[in-house]
């Protein structure tokens, strides 16, 4: 017999929906927005590394990094 906990009772409805697909777009727009924001983040990091994005008072001298 499985132990019944308060947390298990709270999470039970989420497990009951397992395998069901919501018709329509669902959370696709949120996922797309998250991917775009992550891409922008990566581009900013790349530009800082490549020194094509200059930030005041931030010295990017990799020779003296250690």
Swiss-Prot record:
Keywords: Chloroplast, Membrane, Photosynthesis, Photosystem II, Plastid, Thylakoid, Transmembrane, Transmembrane helix. The chain crosses the membrane at residues 29-49. Gene3D superfamilies: Photosystem II reaction center protein H (1.20.5.880). The keyword Glycoprotein does not apply. InterPro entries: PSII_PsbH, PSII_PsbH_sf. PSII is composed of 1 copy each of membrane proteins PsbA, PsbB, PsbC, PsbD, PsbE, PsbF, PsbH, PsbI, PsbJ, PsbK, PsbL, PsbM, PsbT, PsbX, PsbY, PsbZ, Psb30/Ycf12, at least 3 peripheral proteins of the oxygen-evolving complex and a large number of cofactors. It forms dimeric complexes. One of the components of the core complex of photosystem II (PSII), required for its stability and/or assembly. PSII is a light-driven water:plastoquinone oxidoreductase that uses light energy to abstract electrons from H(2)O, generating O(2) and a proton gradient subsequently used for ATP formation. It consists of a core antenna complex that captures photons, and an electron transfer chain that converts photonic excitation into a charge separation. This is Photosystem II reaction center protein H.
